[in-house]
């Protein structure tokens, strides 16, 4: 490797993905450094309000015997910190070091941080798909006075108790919106309205998210080699029956579920129990003025607060390469990666987790991918430049990576090993670290 670099690998982001990649870089004998812009590890979880939690079961979030005491924000932060403590990673993490510019100079990556420049031969951008809260553009008068209508993104609602007695308008059709509906109902909002353009599939259930969010049944379908079309048909039939049983036919998504494209979200029990009380509007928010919200249908509403459950975007503007800087969504980013992780727009650049869609084990997924990225850097694996054009869930990822990384996926630890693990592991037990 070039003598002009300081490190074999730099990793932008000290969240779960970044720390796992640091661990596997060290296991591979690479000199690696994590650059984290915040004052501590944890990524986005460090900034989220305490009520935020995961929407998969605990066993699918963590891996090995790394501790996870619960699904909430504080417990998730503690689990992420446990990677630092268990594997003595702290000396490889540079905090308060946001990257303002990333440029490949033809020989290595140069990363500008507040106190200088870090150079590395390879770069992992472990910034996730939740870099920046997304709020759609709406019309506002140029000379608008202060609006009576308060606006909060889901990440900015610090205390849901403040919703008590308020007229609430929730905007969005995915997991963040479902959470906001649930919180509004739980904390006594006077009236709850819901605006959505399109709806994502979710699993109607009375079970908590951390129970309903288990992906193990789906993994077993893969392990039994059930064809994708049949998997989709089985899941679609089950979901439609659940929607009918809960009286939710009015919000059936317009398309049949396709696990190559869709994320499967667990339902929120309180939202389902009070579904009839939620005033629903299909459309978008077009304008917000001094005291009202106008929808694309022409309806004019007067809520006290608008809660934006519109998710997050990807912020890559620190990249010097214009094609990268222009990417703003996880879907765009995934389409610009070959072999799941490898950037098509820059040399020696990797984006972990772009195919992770909530139907898989989070830490395990990152660990499997990190191991192969390190093998590629060391020259024992080959990440090709062919985009996948679909989500790769769990065992699909093993099928894709195994022939490209024979050193990690040996005859003893290849497809059959992970198939047997999927079928044999107790549902409440995390998968072992690879």
Model segments located where?
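Polar, surface-exposed loop/tail segments
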Residues: 382-392
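Glycine-rich phosphate/pyrophosphate-binding loop and the adjoining helix
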Residues: 394-414
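Conserved N-terminal glycine-rich FAD pyrophosphate-binding loop of Rossmann-like flavoproteins
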Residues: 39-63, 202-218
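Flavin (primarily FAD) cofactor-binding/catalytic cores of flavoenzymes
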Residues: 2-44, 68-200, 206, 219-383, ...
């Amino acid at each position: 490797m070039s003598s002009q670099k300081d490190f074999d690998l730099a990793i932008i982001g000290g969240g779960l993905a970044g720390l796992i990649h640091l661990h596997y870089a060290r296991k591979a004998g690479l000199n690696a450094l994590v650059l984290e812009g915040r004052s501590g590890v944890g990524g986005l979880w460090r900034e989220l309000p305490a009520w935020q939690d995961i929407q998969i079961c605990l066993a699918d979030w963590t891996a090995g015997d790394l501790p996870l005491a619960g699904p909430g924000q504080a417990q998730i932060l503690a689990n992420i910190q446990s990677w630092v403590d268990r594997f003595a990673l702290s000396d490889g993490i540079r905090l308060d070091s946001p990257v303002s510019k990333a440029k490949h100079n033809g020989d290595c990556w140069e990363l500008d941080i507040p106190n200088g420049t870090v150079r590395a031969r390879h770069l992992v951008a472990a910034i996730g798909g939740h870099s920046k809260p997304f709020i759609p553009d709406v019309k506002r008068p140029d000379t608008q006075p202060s609006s009576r209508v308060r606006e909060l993104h889901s990440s900015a609602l610090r205390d849901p108790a403040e919703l008590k007695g308020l007229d609430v308008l929730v905007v969005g059709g995915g997991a963040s919106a479902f959470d906001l509906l649930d919180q509004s109902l739980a904390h006594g909002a006077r009236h709850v309205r819901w605006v959505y353009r399109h709806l994502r599939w979710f699993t109607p259930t009375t079970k908590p998210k951390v129970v309903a969010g288990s992906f193990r049944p789906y993994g077993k379908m893969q392990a039994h080699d059930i064809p994708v079309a049949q998997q989709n048909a089985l899941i679609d039939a089950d979901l439609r029956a659940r929607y009918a049983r809960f009286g939710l036919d009015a919000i059936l998504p317009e398309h049949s579920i396709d696990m190559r494209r869709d994320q499967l979200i667990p339902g929120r029990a309180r939202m389902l129990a009070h579904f009839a009380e939620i005033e629903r509007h299909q459309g978008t928010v077009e304008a917000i003025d001094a005291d009202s919200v106008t929808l694309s249908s022409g309806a004019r509403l007067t809520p006290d607060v608008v809660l934006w459950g519109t998710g997050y975007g990807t912020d890559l503007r620190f990249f010097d390469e214009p094609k990268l800087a222009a990417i703003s969504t996880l879907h765009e980013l995934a389409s610009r990666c070959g072999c799941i992780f490898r950037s098509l727009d820059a040399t020696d650049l990797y984006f972990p987790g772009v195919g992770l869609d909530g139907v898989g084990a989070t830490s395990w997924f990152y660990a499997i991918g990190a191991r192969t990225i390190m093998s590629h850097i060391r020259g024992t694996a080959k990440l090709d430049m062919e985009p996948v054009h679909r989500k790769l869930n769990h065992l699909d990822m093993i099928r894709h990576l195994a022939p490209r990384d024979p050193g990690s996926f040996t005859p003893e630890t290849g497809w059959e090993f992970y198939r047997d693990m999927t079928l044999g592991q107790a549902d409440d037990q995390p998968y072992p670290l690879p």
